[in-house]
């Protein structure tokens, strides 16, 4: 399978690199400069997956979670490392004169994986229910995809004052550390909103639910801003809105398929929540990475990708069982197969796109050319 078209291979060497307009408070005033780059970021991604499995196996209780508190602390530390590496890897690449379209793709690819995994980690740490974790997953992935869709038109990845790569990750670090120190009980504190609204609204909610609700609102507001900016830019570029709005079709198919699947068989998600979200994360990352490749190579957007076939197949399998009472394949097996297939697609894409880009750009992956100037050591 070839991921770059002949047209893309011609355009790829001429790619000048997109720019990131990061208004983040953390990025401008707090984040330090270091020597590390994508390797530790990739390590953090694999740790995130391991964290989810370790927590899922321990199954701590609200009354006694002392046996796994160290995992929450370790999670916070690894999110911090990932955040630092993600913020400085571009600086390190420019410093060593190894900036390339492949490095940009690798950076955003790691981000796409962590965008799906981070809500799962924080949700487990804060004791959020499975359905709320899924809502948080959707709330995180929608603005992320739309931000890269917007970049296709503007050639700028715009990150607002409160954004995922920094502020949201800092909040995740804080939440994990608080859980590790005090335990999950702190997130189940009841808040009486009738006091804040002069008794006009009678509502009492848990702290963790209120936090996730606020984060979801911020995500959807950000997504709306992405759509508005992309629409204005498409009009300025004289691109028909039909063409512009058809480009997110793969993500819309992904989103709608998942919603229908959960509507048909909610118990299936509750039985395998971690495997389910990991499968969705791999498919989401695949779709986003293909979008980035098309932007870098100045190719036309594709409206469908092969991993979506298997997601749709799982939905149809469940629909046949619910409406026709025909069990083509056991639902639990279908979830596990989707996980294996989506992971396989992600591995194949990663290996193949590295080979293709290295061949076109005449570079070696994860190496600093000998012709590059030596790096000065920090005192």
From Swiss-Prot:
Record gene name: captD
Family: Belongs to the CDP-alcohol phosphatidyltransferase class-I family.
Alphabetic keyword roster: Membrane, Transferase, Transmembrane, Transmembrane helix
Lipid bilayer topology: Multi-pass membrane protein
Protein's recorded name: Uncharacterized CDP-alcohol phosphatidyltransferase class-I family protein 4
Gene Ontology cellular component list: membrane
GO MF entry, a single one: phosphotransferase activity, for other substituted phosphate groups
Organism: Dictyostelium discoideum
Coiled-coil features, chain-numbered ranges: none
Location within or outside the cell: Membrane
Residues passing through the membrane, by range: 30-50, 70-90, 117-137, 142-162, 171-191, 210-230, 241-261, 268-288, 308-328, 333-353
Repressor found in the keyword field: no
